[in-house]
Amino acid sequence: MLEKVLEELCGNLPVERLKALVKLRKRYKVYLLSNINDTLWQKSVSQMNQLGYSTDELFDEVFLSYAMRKEKPSVEIYEEMTQQTGLNPATTLYFDDRAENAEAGKRFGFQSVLVKTNHLEEHQEWQEINKNIKE
């Protein structure tokens, strides 16, 4: 039962998104900032591994709200992440799948993009992004 609930919450990781992250990481710093909890994070890591990816391959650093004891969309979580990474919000492209978080990122100074959560639309969107990433 728990496994089924976790599967519903995590969904399937979009392979096109993972491919884009690998390409982007060749040219840019890539960070993950997530409100995920420990159980769902472990499930996501397991799914990444099953697809042949590791967090070290995809991200320079991972920031998880449960470990930081802060949560998006609070400004404190963005402040801590930028302080630890040295990121300049004005030159940082920030993707989020929740409108309130994308808007909070924009108010913080990020170039903020709201990504689609419909699996078909998201797949198509990331396919297009992949075409436009120069390697």
Regions found by a protein language model. Give the residues of each.
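Substrate-recognition element of Asp-dependent hydrolases with the DxDx(T/V) motif
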Residues: 1-49
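Asp-based, Mg2+/Mn2+-dependent phosphohydrolase catalytic module
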Residues: 37-38, 43-135
